[in-house]
Amino acid sequence: MIQRVPDPDDEFLDFPPSTDRLPAPLPTKAEGPVEPSSDVKSLVGEFRTYLQQTILQDTIVHEQTIPSTPERVALKTSHLGPEVERVLSAAGIEHLWSHQEEGIHLLREGKDVVVATPTASGKTLVYNAAVLADLLLNPAGCAIYIFPLKALEQNQLDELRTLLANLSCGLTAEIYDGDTKPHVREKIRKQLPNILITTPDMLHAGILAFHEAWEEMLNNLRWIVVDELHTYNGIFGSHVLHLFRRLNRLCSSYGSSPRYVSCSATIGNPTQLAERLFGRSFTAVTESGAPTAPRHFLFVDPVESPNTVAARLLQAGVLRQLRTIVFTRARVITELVYRWATQHRHDLAQRISSYRAGYLPEERRQIESALTGGDLLGVVTTSALELGIDIGGLDVCVLVGYPGSIVNTWQRAGRVGRQGRESLVILLASKDALDQYFMKYPDQFFGRDIEDAVADPGNRYILKNHLPCAARELPLTADEPEYDGITGYAEALAELAASGDLLQSADGDAWFAARKQPHRLLNMRAIGESWSIVAGASARVADTSPPATESPDSTPTAETVTPPRPPLPGSSDLFGSGNSAHAGCDHGGSPVESEVSRSGASLVRDAAPSARSGKKKRYTIGTVSGGQLYTECYEGAIYLHRGRQYLIGERHSPRRQIDASVVDVPYYTRPKQEKETEIIEELASKPMHGYLAKLGRLKVSSQVIAYEKVRVGDQVIISRHPLESPVQTFETIGFWLEMDAPFKKHLKRNGHHHMGSLHATEHATKSLFPLLALSKGTDVGGICCPMHPQLRKGAIFIYDQYPGGIGLAEKGFDMLDRLLELTLGMVAGCDCGEGCPSCIHFPTCGASNHPLDKAGCIHLLELLSGRADLDPEAFDLPETEDEPPLFADWEIAETDAPPEQEEEDHVVVFDLETQLSAAEVGGWNKTYLMRVSCGVVWDNRSDEFTTYLEQDVPKLIEHLQAADLIVGFNCIGFDYSVLRGYSSYDFRKLETLDMLREIKE
């Protein structure tokens, strides 16, 4: 059964903020940065009062202040040595906080340590002090610092060099990453610094791949520092897990045994995550001794869209000289909020910028520098600025929608209020179920445990991608210590040898890489190859048709030209062109000629940045991964970048380039997909409340079949356009709930729509999944089927959205009872009548949220969670064409049987044993949870005993159903009750001779 599902980035869009409510103009100031008031506390308080009386009036549902906390100074100090203590003193550090002292002490004891304390608590000092103290005693030693983002590297290098400058000896530090010039790389390899700063990507492609050139470092490596540990979660975490297995192998080969030290935001399982990623035993430091300033929270449930409210809050904050950051959940929303905040306010355009993934590196560095220096007072961003990039002290954080996890929420909130500054955090709820859950239950947010981070070592695709790289670095053997406990290692070796990616030695004891550089084929951050979005081509936009594009042969190669963009502060004029005649420029110095056709559609021609010469320049505006290619950059899509609209044209596969042209149109676009699931392998099964929950390998197929043009404002669909795109297929891990026909009959007898009930339950369950584990809303997918072709019964599937899985589905399977309870409480507690975005609507449902049955969803969740029982009459199914037969395989076999002949009755003798006792499941009234260990059946026709294990329970039930008489002892009171945990079949229908009942009677 195929269900239509949407693009994950599809969001509810609306009218931009109305101009009649805009704040007063920004006062004219002298050239240079805007300096915020020193009295931040009073400004934040006044701003909060202003918002309560104006923009947020009557929409604040909860206010809470996290009070300040005093510092806890270490009672004793680790002996770092006089040199390091002098350097710290020169940096203004006269004492250590308690968690810093604890971490340094553990490191000096030789332990591997993970420090998981809140943002801005001085975690970096732990590893900097310990590493410097050690390298002063061992000057031939070296350390490698690994950061997930290049921007974090530069921050760390600046901080390190400040410390190193005060040392009497010549310890050095350098950055080695993709932006490092070739001649600088060569110099670094020849003159190895004491501290090498890099990223996982460069560690993979530039260091491990050429480890012979790094012999000196690998021989003398004493420290491996990994910052921002919590980011190594999900698919990226699974890649990094194998990356460090490879690094550990090489260190052992070169004779070094470095210590690990890692820092993380506060997560629920720092020790477990570190041990899983690095393959070592860790000690965690989690109690912070750093002081904190008061942080005020406002939970806001706006009547209008949170996107427009965010734009007005950004304007209001910047106009009051409060440094304001707005976090959104999607790139398109980032661009829209930025555009709406600046399009009517040219005075604000110089003080606000957008920032997200996909911007060019030099663009991002320029924005970061302007924020740090105070040239910018406001920024709209996705999660790209969530990490510890130094962008100066911020005062106000606006969250446009719940970020998806407690971890990410606190990480984003931690961007404001540094250096003892009082701060304000505003959570603007969307109508999504998870947002509304916290609007109704704010105490659940503030009192909730931090989520666990998940990194799955068992992803077979990622394992098979890394093993050829590992074999190229060092030949692999069957007994690799670093792969001990990695599920599927032996099978992966065999599969890679069969495919020709690995070559097995003649004696069969070693495996070698078939390719010279398999590292080049592995991208740890994206699904598929990266494509460049190139602007500068002409395009005519019709009302419903995609633009005409040049042929692939005639399209020039993009030149390296800085794209037109809104100017940063300090530009000579507002548009950055230096020429007031360019009144048609779109905030970027690129003259735009436009006219309006009879149909009202814009006809736009994008001239080149070098218009004077008459030569058109093509320039790269961003990149997109192969995984997003067909959902974001299909021909005819509207792509937003720095507040400008670009019409996507043709794709050029050989160069991996996508044409784009500047346009100004009153609509946005969203794709439509079809999906289906196929069960490949069952990995686990457990009885629930009259049904089975199973975990297994799935094949998910999706195809973008069309896109819609949707008018901004009233959300009217202007037109639909078919698309031809390839089917995208991947294997993953998921769990599913199998519901026999009585569930359908029960729902229908109670007046509910079967498919609508399943569909609503899938939506609601998927919405609350991030409460179980650290994940984004797009990390899990779902599909429901009223009659799955393989199962021949109704089913709801929840699966990881990445090839091979990332461990989330296993988490959901293990905590299924909790997930169903949370979902039931959320849906039943919603005040709406027929369903809404706060309970069963899903913002990106490709079926337009139809059909949905809220009452049926509640009823079904009550059945699934054991709060209600199936109606006994639901088992007596009428013979209707639309109802599948109960236990279809058995009934078909009966239909195909030859005419009944005179023979003896079919009698079986049956008994079973359970895995758990009554005490272990909570009493004899919960025998359905005791789980089958084995069942034994003697059959008079074959005169044989048959043993059934738990995975064979469906066959056991079929065997019992096929008998004319079942003989057992207490099978009615006990054995059938245990089997009811696996099936909704009414076992009272079986003709049974229960000897215990016969004795009692």
Located regions from the model:
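Conserved DEDDh/DEDDy metal-dependent 3′-5′ exonuclease domain
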Residues: 937-1001
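Acidic, low-complexity intrinsically disordered tails
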Residues: 2-23, 28-35, 555, 574-575, ...
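Helicase motor core with emphasis on the C-terminal RecA-like subdomain
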Residues: 53-89, 95-98, 102, 108-109, ...
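Conserved RNase H-like, two-metal-ion catalytic cores of nucleic-acid enzymes
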Residues: 888-965
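Hydrophobic positions on the alpha1 helix immediately C-terminal to the Walker A/P-loop
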Residues: 126
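Extended Lys/Arg-rich polyanion-binding regions
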Residues: 423-425, 431-448, 456, 466-482, ...
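Helicase-associated low-complexity/disordered flanking segments
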Residues: 2-98
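Intrinsic disorder/low-complexity segments
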Residues: 17-36, 538-615
